[in-house]
Amino acid sequence: MGKRILVQRRGRGGIQFRSKDHLKIAPARYPQDGMDNLMRGVIKEILHEPGRHTPISLVELENGQEFYYIPPEGVYEGQEIQIGKGAEVKTGNVLPLSEIPDGSLVCNVEIRPGDGGKIARRSGTYAIVFSHEGDKVILRLPSRKEKLVDARCRATIGVVAGSGRIEKPFMKAGIKYYHERTHPKRWPVVRGVAMNPVSHPHGGGSHKRPGKPTTVARTAPPGQKVGHIAARKTGRAKRRAATKR
């Protein structure tokens, strides 16, 4: 009788591979009704959500509506923020890209107007408003690539809070264990060549190499689909091609 390998179990979606939804507070998105008018609000709380690499802030608007958004560095509880057209260009405020000057650092940028924010949401990240071209704006992303987006898309002025998160070492495996438990994945990750042959196609033998070609077809069965899946190139030729780019 065969044995299902780890990638098959992950694809089935057992409880250890699922997101810990009961630990989540709420999605961090901009309100839908703040596209064409100016709204004011107050940051009521700055919270920590397990599994999220940034703080999350609860904002209460003048009309009593509440929403959560990703705070930039420098904001504090009780601070007043502005959202929408005509807002002041100030850290923590949310404006359409058409009203943000060139060279400004922004975070939680929308890709499409009204989607709530998709770009530069991780701790310490930001995008740069590179230039304005009519009804479009060129953004320089954290990856240094440039992207053309609609000028009506909203963004938060500033850099996402928590920039020094990765500078502190874990020091102990137990701390790392509890950190990884909040994420929808299994940890630690074991190499296939370190497994038994019954657990992985690369396992077995008194050596730490696969012992067979690691390229498999796109149409391979699930128990065989590990390694370089439908790879055009592997090895030195692939590295040389990447260097030339």
From Swiss-Prot:
- One Pfam annotation reads Ribosomal_L2
What keywords does the record list, in alphabetical order? Ribonucleoprotein, Ribosomal protein, RNA-binding, rRNA-binding
Which terms in the Gene Ontology molecular function aspect does this entry carry?
RNA binding; rRNA binding; structural constituent of ribosome
Q: Which SUPFAM superfamilies match?
A: Nucleic acid-binding proteins, Translation proteins SH3-like domain
Could you tell me the Gene Ontology terms of the biological process aspect for this record? cytoplasmic translation
The answer to whether keyword rRNA-binding applies is yes
Give the record's GO CC terms.
cytosolic large ribosomal subunit
Give the compositionally biased regions (Basic residues). Answer: 230-245
- The set of disulfide-linked cysteines is none
The UniProt annotation puts the region (Disordered) at 198-245
Q: Which Gene3D superfamilies match?
A: 2.30.30.30, Nucleic acid-binding proteins, Ribosomal protein L2, domain 3
Question: How is this protein organized at the quaternary level?
Answer: Part of the 50S ribosomal subunit. Forms a bridge to the 30S subunit in the 70S ribosome.
Tell me the protein family, please.
Answer: Belongs to the universal ribosomal protein uL2 family.
Q: What does this protein do?
A: One of the primary rRNA binding proteins. Required for association of the 30S and 50S subunits to form the 70S ribosome, for tRNA binding and peptide bond formation. It has been suggested to have peptidyltransferase activity; this is somewhat controversial. Makes several contacts with the 16S rRNA in the 70S ribosome.
Q: HAMAP family, from UniProt?
A: Ribosomal_uL2_A (MF_01320_A)
The name of this protein is Large ribosomal subunit protein uL2
Q: Lineage from the top down?
A: Archaea, Thermoproteota, Candidatus Korarchaeia, Candidatus Korarchaeales, Candidatus Korarchaeaceae
